[in-house]
C-alpha cells in the first residue's frame, strides 16, 4: 500500500518505532503509545518522508478505522482527511481574507502539510496576521470529534517561537507528537 501511494517509498529500520506507533494509532490499538482521539503532529528533518507517511496514514485509516460521524451531522463516512499545504492556506487568506480560512477550520478532518514554510504574516486589504496561527486556534475550537494533522520541519520549540505559547499549549491537547529524524530520502 505504501508503494501505491509513493512508488519509491522505503521504510527505514531506524524509524520502525515511529512506524509502529503511527500504525497502532491508525488501528486504535488499546495498548498503543499514541492517543487515538488526537491528531498526528509529524515533525522532523527535511526529506524524511513525513508528508508521504501522512498520505499512507490517510489511505490505511480509510480501510481500518471505523466510520466517522462528524459534528456537521453528515452521514457516517470512512475516515479520511484533506491534506493542504501551509502555503496554500496562507495564500487563501491573501486572496479572500478570513473567508478564505473558514474551510480549513470547518473541514471535519484537515491536515496541514509543511507547517512553517508559509510567510510569518500575510496581508489582506491592510489587515495582517499569521493565517496558520488563526487556523490552528480555530481547529482547537472544533477539536472534539474532528481531527487535525500536521507535518512540519519545525521542532516544537521552533513552532512555539513562531506561533506562540497559546497555540502550542493547545497543540499539546490536539496532537500526538511524532518525530522522524534522519537523512533526506530525496535524490
Language model features with spans:
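N-terminal pre-Walker A segment at the start of P-loop NTPase domains
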Residues: 2-33
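Walker A (P-loop) ATP-phosphate-binding motif of ABC ATPase nucleotide-binding domains
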Residues: 39
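Hydrophobic anchor at the beta1->P-loop junction of P-loop NTPases
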Residues: 42
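Conserved glycine(s) of the Walker
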Residues: 47-53
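Active-site signature of alpha/beta-hydrolase-fold catalytic machinery across serine-
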Residues: 56
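Walker A/P-loop NTP-binding motif
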Residues: 59-62
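Conserved nucleotide-sensing/catalytic segment adjacent to the nucleotide-binding pocket
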Residues: 71-143
Amino acid at each position: 500500500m505504501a508503494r501505491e501511494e509513493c512508488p519509491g517509498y522505503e521504510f527505514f529500520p531506524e524509524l520502525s518505532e515511529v512506524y509502529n506507533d503511527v500504525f497502532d494509532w491508525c488501528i486504535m490499538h488499546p495498548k498503543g503509545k499514541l492517543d487515538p482521539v488526537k491528531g498526528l503532529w509529524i515533525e522532523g528533518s527535511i526529506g524524511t518522508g513525513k508528508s508521504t507517511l501522512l498520505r499512507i496514514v490517510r489511505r490505511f485509516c480509510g480501510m481500518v478505522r471505523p466510520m466517522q460521524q462528524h459534528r456537521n451531522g453528515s452521514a457516517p463516512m470512512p475516515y479520511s482527511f484533506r491534506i493542504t499545504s501551509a502555503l496554500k492556506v496562507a495564500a487563501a487568506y491573501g486572496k479572500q481574507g478570513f473567508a478564505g480560512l473558514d474551510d480549513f477550520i470547518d473541514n471535519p478532518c484537515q491536515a496541514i502539510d509543511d507547517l512553517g514554510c508559509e510567510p510569518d504574516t500575510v496581508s489582506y486589504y491592510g489587515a495582517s496576521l499569521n493565517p496558520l496561527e488563526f487556523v490552528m486556534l480555530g481547529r482547537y475550537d472544533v477539536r472534539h470529534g474532528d481531527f487535525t494533522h500536521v507535518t512540519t520541519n519545525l521542532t516544537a520549540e521552533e513552532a512555539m517561537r513562531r506561533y506562540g505559547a497559546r497555540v502550542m499549549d493547545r497543540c499539546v491537547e490536539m496532537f500526538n507528537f511524532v518525530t522522524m529524524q534522519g537523512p533526506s530520502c530525496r535524490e
